[in-house]
Amino acid sequence: MIGGLFIYNHKGEVLISRVYRDDIGRNAVDAFRVNVIHARQQVRSPVTNIARTSFFHVKRSNIWLAAVTKQNVNAAMVFEFLYKMCDVMTAYFGKISEENIKNNFVLIYELLDEILDFGYPQNSETGALKTFITQQGIKSQTKEEQSQITSQVTGQIGWRREGIKYRRNELFLDVLESVNLLMSPQGQVLSAHVSGRVVMKSYLSGMPECKFGMNDKIVIEKQGKGTADETGKSGKQSIAIDDCTFHQCVRLSKFDSERSISFIPPDGEFELMRYRTTKDIILPFRVIPLVREVGRTKLEVKVVIKSNFKPSLLAQKIEVRIPTPLNTSGVQVICMKGKAKYKASENAIVWKIKRMAGMKESQISAEIELLPTNDKKKWARPPISMNFEVPFAPSGLKVRYLKVFEPKLNYSDHDVIKWVRYIGRSGIYETRC
């Protein structure tokens, strides 16, 4: 019946994904995002057919719910399920928003397991569901201090046991960021944001006190703190964060007053913080496309990529995907660097470059032969997408210091071996052509 259910935010990012049939693949997720959410013209029909796949979709606020199937199903039944799903989520955690969905993703998957059985709707009555799933949803952001009440009263640290000993004290810190971009053919940034995580691996003896400092000035836009002078400075000295969440070990009072992160770390690997920013983003690459139609049976495509970071840095795992029309019969490709190949099954030219230094550029040219067609509708020109990995944080986040103190075992910051690494990766990095 229903092959898969996907919940997207307004940018086309998948928040919830559940696949019930083997014939629904990853390409279905991308097809809906490109042809419906990012469509140049507003899609009015609630049912969209793409490559023999039907997408039944509803929109609540800025959230899209899409049921996908390749079978001939009862459309009324599918929409009944989608609206019931919206009602059930509202009953459990209130308003359907990106924040609430992220906070309650475990609950949503439990609800889907009860409501759908191999893609067939079974039980969607809220009253009946609450007898099976008694978990209460998180309706709004709660103060993180509440999660630390027990440990503050009893004096116990629930996330770390006592008596931990290591022969060598080490601390590894990774700043992992995903940069998302949608750019116009003229080079205008239509939307851009960075989602980041600070991941730490702690191999420290005893109960160490850690202090972690970032850029000289941090402005939390969501809280409305900071002044215009702070946000106007370069990304190296200041960073404007739209929202952030911390591990329960972080003392939030210190962060509010000093903008430093103080904590007793759990043993091993954990996520210290997660954040999102939309201002002063360093875009690692710019894609400049040029598509020229030569009659009705030929296209000439030229794509230039320019790296926008220090020459001493190297980007890796670079991949550019240039879409081609469905009636493509042959492609001739010439690239300055790397390797390029036309993949007919994906209707795209895939250009791969192993490494590329900063402040460099490279280009690819292609001649695309087209089969004659009676279809008068022009090619939609899907956006060119790009994947890459760079050794810096596109948000401009910098680690200023990382200090460790352990008064009981009498070892100090100088006795700890510390490693800091920055990794920036592409999320949905697209340029319209």
UniProtKB/Swiss-Prot annotation:
<keyword id="KW-0653">Protein transport</keyword>
<keyword id="KW-0254">Endocytosis</keyword>
<keyword id="KW-0813">Transport</keyword>
<dbReference type="InterPro" id="IPR028565">
    <property type="entry name" value="MHD"/>
</dbReference>
<dbReference type="Pfam" id="PF01217">
    <property type="entry name" value="Clat_adaptor_s"/>
</dbReference>
<dbReference type="InterPro" id="IPR022775">
    <property type="entry name" value="AP_mu_sigma_su"/>
</dbReference>
<comment type="similarity">
    <text>Belongs to the adaptor complexes medium subunit family.</text>
</comment>
<dbReference type="GO" id="GO:0008289">
    <property type="term" value="F:lipid binding"/>
</dbReference>
<comment type="subunit">
    <text>Adaptor protein complex 2 (AP-2) is a heterotetramer composed of two large adaptins (alpha-type subunit and beta-type subunit), a medium adaptin (mu-type subunit) and a small adaptin (sigma-type subunit).</text>
</comment>
<dbReference type="Pfam" id="PF00928">
    <property type="entry name" value="Adap_comp_sub"/>
</dbReference>
<dbReference type="GO" id="GO:0006886">
    <property type="term" value="P:intracellular protein transport"/>
</dbReference>
<dbReference type="GO" id="GO:0030122">
    <property type="term" value="C:AP-2 adaptor complex"/>
</dbReference>
<feature type="binding site">
    <location>
        <position position="339"/>
    </location>
    <ligand>
        <name>a 1,2-diacyl-sn-glycero-3-phospho-(1D-myo-inositol-3,4,5-trisphosphate)</name>
    </ligand>
</feature>
<feature type="binding site">
    <location>
        <position position="352"/>
    </location>
    <ligand>
        <name>a 1,2-diacyl-sn-glycero-3-phospho-(1D-myo-inositol-3,4,5-trisphosphate)</name>
    </ligand>
</feature>
<feature type="binding site">
    <location>
        <position position="343"/>
    </location>
    <ligand>
        <name>a 1,2-diacyl-sn-glycero-3-phospho-(1D-myo-inositol-3,4,5-trisphosphate)</name>
    </ligand>
</feature>
<dbReference type="GO" id="GO:0031410">
    <property type="term" value="C:cytoplasmic vesicle"/>
</dbReference>
<feature type="domain" description="MHD">
    <location>
        <begin position="168"/>
        <end position="432"/>
    </location>
</feature>
<dbReference type="InterPro" id="IPR043512">
    <property type="entry name" value="Mu2_C"/>
</dbReference>
<keyword id="KW-0168">Coated pit</keyword>
<dbReference type="InterPro" id="IPR018240">
    <property type="entry name" value="Clathrin_mu_CS"/>
</dbReference>
<dbReference type="GO" id="GO:0072583">
    <property type="term" value="P:clathrin-dependent endocytosis"/>
</dbReference>
<dbReference type="InterPro" id="IPR050431">
    <property type="entry name" value="Adaptor_comp_med_subunit"/>
</dbReference>
<dbReference type="InterPro" id="IPR043532">
    <property type="entry name" value="AP2_Mu_N"/>
</dbReference>
<keyword id="KW-0446">Lipid-binding</keyword>
<dbReference type="InterPro" id="IPR036168">
    <property type="entry name" value="AP2_Mu_C_sf"/>
</dbReference>
<dbReference type="GO" id="GO:0035615">
    <property type="term" value="F:clathrin adaptor activity"/>
</dbReference>
<dbReference type="InterPro" id="IPR011012">
    <property type="entry name" value="Longin-like_dom_sf"/>
</dbReference>
<protein>
    <recommendedName>
        <fullName>AP-2 complex subunit mu</fullName>
    </recommendedName>
</protein>
<dbReference type="InterPro" id="IPR001392">
    <property type="entry name" value="Clathrin_mu"/>
</dbReference>
<keyword id="KW-0472">Membrane</keyword>
<comment type="function">
    <text>Component of the adaptor complexes which link clathrin to receptors in coated vesicles. Clathrin-associated protein complexes are believed to interact with the cytoplasmic tails of membrane proteins, leading to their selection and concentration. AP50 is a subunit of the plasma membrane adaptor. The complex binds polyphosphoinositide-containing lipids.</text>
</comment>
<keyword id="KW-1003">Cell membrane</keyword>
